[in-house]
A protein has these predicted regions:
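Hydrophobic alpha-helical and helix-loop surface patches within well-folded domains
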Residues: 1, 171, 200-445, 451
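Glycine/proline-rich low-complexity spacer/linker segments in large multi-domain proteins
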Residues: 1-12, 70-124, 520-536
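Short, solvent-exposed loop/turn and secondary-structure capping segments
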Residues: 44, 75-84, 137-140, 181-184, ...
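Short, hydrophobic/aromatic-enriched beta-strand segments in well-ordered soluble domains
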Residues: 61-75, 124-132, 169-175, 512-520
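Hydrophobic helix-coil surface modules that form long, contiguous segments used
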Residues: 97-106, 113-267, 296
Length: 536
């Protein structure tokens, strides 16, 4: 892992690496690399190995590479390592030399700094020889499950007794772009089956409360998987493992390493199976397509789970429901003056703060706000179409945008341009209200630099309400009515005009309140001027 100068260090790293002894650091040393038995010349550039082939590989041809490398497992600091804070002996991620991705833009060779990655799908056959007392969870299916036992052949079976000092574990995984595993002699194993998927929960049991919390992870996974399959597209792999290990939470194909049994992290890391493991966007260049889409899915899954458990949202929860935290994070970043465009590569933000908010919060809001623009139901159809068209194909932002435009029938280039490529903000306000010839006239003003369509709610003194909708001319159309609620559609608001006047057939005296964007899905940086309450 490379370490450079940053104005705000990751608190989990800081200067800890520099304090490791020679026996505690991690390294990988390439001993040899052969192609079809012929040694190949290599050069090492930091964390990148360049191979100048002695013979070109023709299109459609097949070759076999054999690599011998030596590695030392570091004391766990980030992602991979031994003896983490929770006492897990080995958290084995980023443990082998991994192929760089080659796509339609060429080779992707960023230095690895323990953040995002972009990988090549392939089939893995991994054999691990380890002390017989260790228990392992990881990517893939255990091929020799009968010889191992420990719940892998049948739930509840113990680890098989063997006479040798080491035990052999053989995992196989198809169509994945990475492989992770963790090992500890004190691991416990919970197994559930749901809709053809084996759900493994592997953890260290400290006490009965800890065991109950991990049992809750298994129950929650069992509850939400059918919803995830229906909402985001069917999970295509035979198993998924929630494994205690690493630090925080980190996603891998068919598995995640978790610090603890918190369900928010559980749902987030599992959602990465869709928005990274199956779709495989370049999260180094477009982390919002990975972390942001995943955070949106996490919010939706968490809301579903809570509804199944009988929880109801508090009246004090800020709108939009399920995603309010993302909006708070984004608004704080805007106020800080540290905002950067979402086109910034993940490793090249000026601050970790801006990276985190852009990748997670603003990326999440990209989808909640897309629901505001095209309707939530159309947005959900877009996400399923995106899954169907682009899984296992490495989509770029333009590919997602094309799907969104095709499904919605609306022009959305402007949305990506403003929200992704700039730091311009949204701010609409109620300018003035008056009566003329028995009709009321409302003037709205665009104060921010980013244009949007407008949802408007009128409340009258008799407690009745009206929903009004002002399309944005840039979309060349409008969204359908939402939730079957009738509405009044007005002429388009031309994006070049800072003000808009709306006429409605009610006397001013009958009006009680006017509210812009009552669902709060629009990321208006100053909602204080969105509501006008009339005191008669």
């Amino acid at each position: 892992m490379l370490v450079g100068n940053r104005p705000d260090w990751d608190s989990r790293v800081k200067d800890r690496i520099s304090k490791l002894s020679p026996t505690e650091i991690g390294y990988q040393k390439i001993i040899s690399l052969k192609m079809n038995g012929v040694e190949q010349p290599v050069k090492v550039y930091g964390t990148i190995l360049e191979v100048n082939l002695t013979k070109p590989i023709a299109p459609g041809a097949k070759v076999t590479f054999d690599m011998v490398f030596e590695a030392q497992v570091p004391v766990q600091i980030r992602r991979s390592g031994r003896d983490n804070a929770e006492g897990v002996r080995y958290s084995m991620s980023q443990w082998y030399p991994k192929m760089c991705e080659y796509d339609n833009t060429g080779w992707h060779t960023p230095q690895y700094v323990a953040r995002e990655f972009y990988g090549v799908w392939g089939d893995y056959d991994v054999t691990i020889h380890i002390d017989k007392n260790y228990k392992i969870g990881g990517t893939g299916v255990l091929k020799n499950a009968v010889a191992i036992g420990w719940g892998y052949d049948k739930p509840g079976t113990p680890l098989k007794n063997i006479s040798t000092a080491r035990r052999t574990w053989n995992f196989v995984a198809q169509n994945v772009h990475d492989f992770v595993w963790a090992a500890d002699p004190d691991f416990e194993h919970i197994v559930r089956n749901r809709e053809g998927v084996v759900l493994n929960v592997i953890y260290k049991a400290k006490d009965s409360a800890t065991t109950a919390a991990w049992e809750n992870v298994a129950e929650a996974a069992y509850i939400v998987l059918p919803y995830m399959n229906k909402r985001f597209g069917k999970y295509p792999y035979p198993q998924y493992s929630f494994i205690q290990g690493g630090d925080g939470g980190m996603e891998y194909p068919m598995a995640t390493l978790l610090k603890g049994p918190g369900l928010g992290t559980v749902f987030h890391e599992w959602m990465h199976s869709w928005y990274q493991m199956m779709l495989g966007s370049n999260e180094i260049e477009h982390p919002w397509m990975d972390e942001g889409f995943t955070s949106w899915g996490e919010g939706e899954v968490n809301a579903y789970y809570r509804s199944q458990k009988g929880f109801t949202p508090s009246a004090r929860v800020m709108l939009p429901l399920n995603h309010a935290g993302a909006y708070r994070g984004y608004f704080s970043l805007v106020k800080s003056g540290l905002a950067e465009p979402m086109t910034t590569f993940s490793d090249h933000y000026n601050t970790n703060y801006a990276y985190s908010v852009n990748a997670y919060s603003k990326g999440e809001m990209y989808l909640t706000q897309l629901g505001y623009i095209v309707s939530d139901s159309v947005r959900d159809a877009i996400m399923l179409a995106y899954y169907d068209k682009w899984r296992f194909k490495h989509p770029a932002p333009s590919d997602f945008l094309k799907v969104a435009k095709d499904v919605s029938g609306l022009q959305l280039n402007w949305y990506n341009e403003y929200w992704i490529n700039t730091t311009k903000t949204i701010d609409y306000g109620i300018d003035s209200l008056w009566e003329e010839n028995g009709k009321s006239i409302l003037r709205l003003r665009r104060i921010g630099d980013m244009p949007m369509p407008i949802d408007l709610k009128l409340t009258f003194k008799d407690s009745t309400t009206e929903t009004h909708y002002i399309p944005l001319d840039l979309t060349l159309g409008g969204k359908p009515a939402e939730d079957g609620e009738p509405r009044i559609v007005h002429p388009d608001w031309n994006w070049t005009n800072p003000t808009y006047e709306m006429v409605f057939d009610k006397k001013l005296f009958d009006l009680k309140a006017v509210e812009i964007d009552p669902t709060r899905r629009m990321a208006d940086v100053d909602p204080n001027n969105n509501v006008l309450e009339l005191k008669w």
